[in-house]
From Swiss-Prot:
InterPro entries: dGTP_triP_hydro_central_sf, dGTP_triphosphohydrolase_C, dGTPase, dGTPase-like, dNTPase_3, HD/PDEase_dom, HD_domain
Key word Hydrolase present: yes
One BP annotation, GO: dGTP catabolic process
Taxonomic classification: Bacteria, Bacillati, Bacillota, Bacilli, Bacillales
GO molecular function, one term: dGTPase activity
A Pfam family annotated for this UniProt entry: HD
The species this protein was found in: Listeria monocytogenes serovar 1/2a (strain ATCC BAA-679 / EGD-e)
Regions that span the bilayer: none
Stretches assigned to the HD domain: 63-252
Protein family membership: Belongs to the dGTPase family. Type 3 subfamily.
Stored PANTHER family: DEOXYGUANOSINETRIPHOSPHATE TRIPHOSPHOHYDROLASE (PTHR11373:SF32), DEOXYNUCLEOSIDE TRIPHOSPHATE TRIPHOSPHOHYDROLASE (PTHR11373)
Location of the region described as Disordered in the Swiss-Prot/TrEMBL record: 1-22
Name by which UniProt lists this protein: Deoxyguanosinetriphosphate triphosphohydrolase-like protein
Taxonomy, superkingdom: Bacteria
Amino acid sequence: MKWDKLLNDKRRRESGVTRSKNTDVRSAFENDFQRIVMSASFRRLQDKTQVFPLEKSDFVRTRLTHSMEVSTIAKSMGNMVTHTIQEENLDQDFTKDHAEKIPEILACAGLLHDMGNPPFGHFGEESIREWFRDNLATITYKNKSLAEILTPQMKEDFYYFEGNAQVLRVVSKLHYLFDQYGLNLTFATLNAVIKYPVSSLKVNKKQIKSKKLGYFYADESLFNEITTATEALDNRHPLTYLLEVADDIAYLNADLEDGVKKGIVNITQILKGFEEVEEHNKVTAACYNELKKKSERYEGQEESFIVQQWLASNVRGQLINRSLEVFYENYDAIMAGTFNDSLIDASSAEQLVQILQSLSFTYIYQDKGIVESEIAGNEIISKLLETFIPAVIYYDSETPERQTAKDKRLLTLISDNYLGCYRKNAEGESETMKLYLRLLLVTDFICGMTDSYAKDLYQRLNGLS
């Protein structure tokens, strides 16, 4: 892979806005950034769960604040990487132009990376997957089950449903501004946000690039168009490795910080989590010792302040620097598409990551309030699927008379954007493809909801409010 192509600043459609060369000095990627920030899809992230579902506290993260943090960390890492590539002469073909583009692309990708997530966080994704696994074989169309009618790839798209794959749909199809191109972002930005460049038929948890579904069957031609333009093809875009680290760092730090602020975990428990690991490497030892020092130095201060200082000044720096060491050491393999690991997992910070993850799992993710909220979120999403999937089965079919009056009324609740996207993509397609697209219509609708809207709609449809 070559940076000239990987950083492709062309768009699927040339911008229809006339820009004055004298007054508009924005780069294509700065333009991407502004399009994202000003989009409704980005604003909706302020009412989508990060860890604490339906959380009303002003302090804890939502998907919006998380995405802003990922964007900031990713851009910072981009600046560090471009500096080192030039200083250490890691790539003779690397230019100043490349160095200017990379941080801008990463800033955009950080904002975008969670834009396809359904309500109620990652548990919402799992709720969608479980519902389809449980119900595709029981819902019928013309006396045949959907599991019999759909192709293997169509079925796997729902069994492996993934918010990251939904990002492509949101920004390139569903976010209708002027036409079918959505936000019409650059090829480089779109490719950087594709974490898993594989279809649902090629999911393989042993490979970093194929751990999860990367794009839906309905978006295969879009995926091919993007990766052909960047010449990444079926390889992971090098910037995706950096985006992944930024995401990991943001959630590892934020989950623990938010947990301390809410009183779910304290410094004594964090130190104990470190002490339960018998032999610390240098990275882990440094972070452990710093937390002990800070807790003694700032004794009497709020624990959330101490942990916040520790995470910002010690943990985050270790995670970034150790991950970037792996990027530099494996630069050629990354550019060749043969590096098969997460930067952070392959680094000397892996032990630290495992401790932080264990602390979050033990004290935060298992907290009674969070578990109760996740169960409520699962019930809401499952019930919405149970309501809307049957309603779309005979919409735009060869037997529309089989739609009930209730089905027709439910369809009026689905956004005209989503219905318009369905009609455009279904035009001239086979009956099976149309049926598949109608199922996607419902997941598009649900993924576009905020937590509050999903909860309110569920309550209204079930006579609870």
